[in-house]
Amino acid sequence: MQRLAVLLLALAVPCAAAATDYTLQPAASTLGFSGTFQGASFNGQFGQWTAAISYDAAKLATSKFDVTVTLASVKTGDKDRDDALPGSDFFNVAKFPQAHFVTTGFHQNGAQVIADGNLILRGVTKPVSLNVTFKPQGGGATLDVAGTVKRLDFGVGTGDYADTSVIGADVKINAHLQLAPK
């Protein structure tokens, strides 16, 4: 009788539903950034990156993003800039080949979902908050993410490049992920 009571109690307690795990569709996804150089805007993208995404808009506490970026895969369309960014003044890929972002939580600001997490870049860990737009699509979904980081917080752009009148202090991060359920 006692076993039956324990079983009934266990069944009566609602289980916390896990977020849906998604697989990134790389060919239809982008991870990019924009900044300014001498007042002119420029855009860039990373060609190699991975993302483990678990998301449930109704239960944000069960959601998680884990993104790793191969920094040497950066492309901006400008040869001089593309040659400089992996170097020691900027990403220093010889010492720090990857950047890593992992969420620590999610919250809502009105209708906007915000992913809070830690970004590790050049060996420096800083909190970063990103706006999230998740749209179910058929069996999968799209996930758009946007936010701003201060490059000097991570030591990106040293020496003459630390001057924010040459290279702007703020770098906008943007990503569009096409996701399929696992």
Regions found by a protein language model. Give the residues of each.
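Low-complexity, acidic/polar, glycine-enriched regions of mature
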Residues: 18-182
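Bacterial N-terminal signal peptides
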Residues: 5-15
